[in-house]
């Protein structure tokens, strides 16, 4: 791997100059906050444990701050960008600041939620500063669509990071926690201050690490069947599962039968259950 140019990464002045040249103003609609600190993006790459043979997919690369740091460490990087102006500019930024690695970069101009395939080798890692307003749907979509993604590190709103990494019994344990755990072991991997972004957001950010399960969850129920139970259980999270799952099962009595068959108390609440227990409930639906 060739050595990167010492000043290849973007600093605060670089980000603002690029944005000004492109006429870009970060929009809340797309949850855009650009990282302006080179040390932060290198820390993200280190925490993600990006390897020289990794094929990394990045969602929402923006002006390219994290993209360039990923290109220093990975074999290939594919970035998915929805914004017309940003997607048009990023290949030129990569070519100008890291010419020796430009042939290792690919840009997909698309909404990440619509991406079903990527150019080149299948991705082995997902590393991204996810737009805050779509972070969870995009994360779950990418994990589902690209089973070769073994390791993921995403930067999201701190509150979302807490939810994703929460375990049963936590007040913030919910649908994102369970669905992420269907695919991977999930944990918090650090915090990011507001001052490394432009513009500075009104909320703190957190890093979340996801390591894909070495074997899929053992269940005869499909993912859709399990997720239907999860959605029903948390739609009325204060209710007992017997009541919350009545609509899903067809009646409270049918819900109770499925719960008892799964070895789960009908008086329990969704926030107390593991993804394995939700799967067992799905298996016992009559």
Curated annotation (Swiss-Prot):
It is found in: Cytoplasm. The lineage of its organism: Bacteria, Bacillati, Actinomycetota, Actinomycetes, Kitasatosporales. Belongs to the class I-like SAM-binding methyltransferase superfamily. rRNA adenine N(6)-methyltransferase family. RsmA subfamily. GO terms for molecular function: 16S rRNA (adenine(1518)-N(6)/adenine(1519)-N(6))-dimethyltransferase activity; RNA binding; rRNA (adenine-N6,N6-)-dimethyltransferase activity. Keywords: Cytoplasm, Methyltransferase, RNA-binding, rRNA processing, S-adenosyl-L-methionine, Transferase. NCBIfam families: ksgA. It comes from the Bacteria. PANTHER family: DIMETHYLADENOSINE TRANSFERASE, DIMETHYLADENOSINE TRANSFERASE-RELATED. Its EC number is 2.1.1.182. Specifically dimethylates two adjacent adenosines (A1518 and A1519) in the loop of a conserved hairpin near the 3'-end of 16S rRNA in the 30S particle. May play a critical role in biogenesis of 30S subunits. GO terms for cellular component: cytosol. S-adenosyl-L-methionine binds at residues 33, 35, 60, 81, 111, 129. This is Ribosomal RNA small subunit methyltransferase A. GO terms for biological process: rRNA methylation. The keyword rRNA processing applies. It catalyses: adenosine(1518)/adenosine(1519) in 16S rRNA + 4 S-adenosyl-L-methionine = N(6)-dimethyladenosine(1518)/N(6)-dimethyladenosine(1519) in 16S rRNA + 4 S-adenosyl-L-homocysteine + 4 H(+).
């Amino acid at each position: 791997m060739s050595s990167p140019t010492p000043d290849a990464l973007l600093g605060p002045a670089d980000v603002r100059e690029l944005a000004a040249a492109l006429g870009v103003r970060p929009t809340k609609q797309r949850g855009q906050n650009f990282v302006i600190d080179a040390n932060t993006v290198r820390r993200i790459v280190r925490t993600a444990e990006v390897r020289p043979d990794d094929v990394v997919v990045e969602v929402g690369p923006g002006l390219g701050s994290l993209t360039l740091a990923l290109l220093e460490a990975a074999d290939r990087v594919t970035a998915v960008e929805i914004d017309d102006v940003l997607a048009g500019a990023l290949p030129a930024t990569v070519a100008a600041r890291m010419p020796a690695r430009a042939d290792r970069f690919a840009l997909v101009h698309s909404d990440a939620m619509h991406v079903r395939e990527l150019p080149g080798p299948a991705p082995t890692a997902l590393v991204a500063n996810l737009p805050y307003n779509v972070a969870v749907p995009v994360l779950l979509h990418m994990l589902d669509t690209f089973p070769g993604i073994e390791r993921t590190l995403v930067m999201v709103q701190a509150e979302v990071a807490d939810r994703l990494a929460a375990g049963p019994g936590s007040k913030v344990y919910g649908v994102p926690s369970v669905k992420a755990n269907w695919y991977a072991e999930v944990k918090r991997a650090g915090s990011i201050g507001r001052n490394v972004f432009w513009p500075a957001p009104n909320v703190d950010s957190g890093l979340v690490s996801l390591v894909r399960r070495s074997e899929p969850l053992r269940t005869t129920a499909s993912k859709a069947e399990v997720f239907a139970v999860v959605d029903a259980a948390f739609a009325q999270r204060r209710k007992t599962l017997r009541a919350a799952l009545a609509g899903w099962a067809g009646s409270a009595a049918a819900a109770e039968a499925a719960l008892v068959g799964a070895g789960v108390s009908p008086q329990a609440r969704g926030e107390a259950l593991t993804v394995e227990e939700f799967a067992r409930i799905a298996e016992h639906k009559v």
